């Protein structure tokens, strides 16, 4: 993992010398093993089973995001990878060893020594979809018409993932309507009905849907929201509604390796959004994207410093509807679409045909209060600091309790949502 280098302009802090920000040579040093080679000790956070599982499926999510980003280099990108990972993890319940191993490697389960991943996944889902989180996330497995599904697959699926598979009727219009009705019910009407046609020769369809509307811990004053320039690149701008807070309390750092400014804003329900803003106006965020892992984001969360800044954030409302089939095939899951062994599901040969994802995400001025939490004490700076999200940026919505990646987005043009 790339080492995190976060600087808060050493020497610009009042009463906070650089020696307080840099660990001593002995502090945190790896302990040598029996061969004398240093062995990095696992962070205690990841020793908690649900957190370790969250890190694994989040790393799957970052992999999936990178593939989607490279496939759409000039547009906004929005994903809720957890809903897709959940569908895959649930499908693995019906896979024999060879096929199960393929899925588990993609989800990074091969790095987890957990005898009961699926019960831990149930705990993860209960945590991230608790009512106070404001996250709606659901996954479903849809099977071809008249398929006989074994009860030995349905029972653990319902127990760990809270869902039952759907068997198609064979009538494309009726089947699409039923799936749309299910999405509407799960998302409380927050995601539009799909007009996409059902695939003609469907065997297994995985569907992952998610919706999130953020509630800031400290709300923005809507009277300060104005139309401002958003710089698409060095030559082009668009006018978009920008929320402002001249005395925002946020967590901040500068990553000199990635040439970006990082800020973290808290949301209600023990969640936060981490923003990555390049030092120069560019639509190429590849260097930042390539660095993203669960461990890297966890390090950022530990290292950022609480400061006061002049903050501007565009109002945002994004949605995505589309197939992720090609992306999953590129993640070494091609065999699931060709000759998998799902004999724990049915006696008939079946294979994955399509993976569909629908997601919606928004934030505006709404928040829990008009002032920061009294316990937040910002570091005092000798000069004012600005953090203006008025150019292409990347954001990560993270569950603070488990570290799970819930949404990830790249915003190249907030007016094109």
From Swiss-Prot:
UniProt record, GO biological process: cellular response to cobalt ion; cellular response to dexamethasone stimulus; cellular response to glucose stimulus; cellular response to retinoic acid; epithelial cell proliferation involved in prostate gland development; kidney development; negative regulation of angiogenesis; negative regulation of endothelial cell migration
Protein name (database record): Pigment epithelium-derived factor
KW Phosphoprotein (keyword) present: yes
Keyword line: Glycoprotein, Phosphoprotein, Pyrrolidone carboxylic acid, Secreted, Signal
Taxonomy, superkingdom: Eukaryota
SMART domains in alphabetical order: SERPIN
Segments for region (Disordered): 17-41
SUPFAM superfamilies in the record: Serpins
Pfam families (UniProt xref): Serpin
Gene Ontology terms, MF aspect: serine-type endopeptidase inhibitor activity
Compositionally skewed regions (Polar residues) per UniProt: 18-28
Modified residues (Phosphoserine): 24
Signal peptide: 1-19
The UniProt record lists the keyword Kinase: no
Glycosylation: residue positions: 284
Family: Belongs to the serpin family.
Subunit and interaction comment: Interacts with PNPLA2; this interaction stimulates the phospholipase A2 activity of PNPLA2.
GO cellular component, one term: melanosome
Tissue/organ expression: Highly expressed in the liver, gastric glandular mucosa and renal tubules. It is also expressed in the brain, heart, lung retina and testes.
Gene3D superfamilies documented for this protein: Alpha-1-antitrypsin, domain 1 (2.30.39.10), Antithrombin, subunit I, domain 2 (3.30.497.10)
Primary localisation category: secreted
Residues bearing PTM Pyrrolidone carboxylic acid: 20
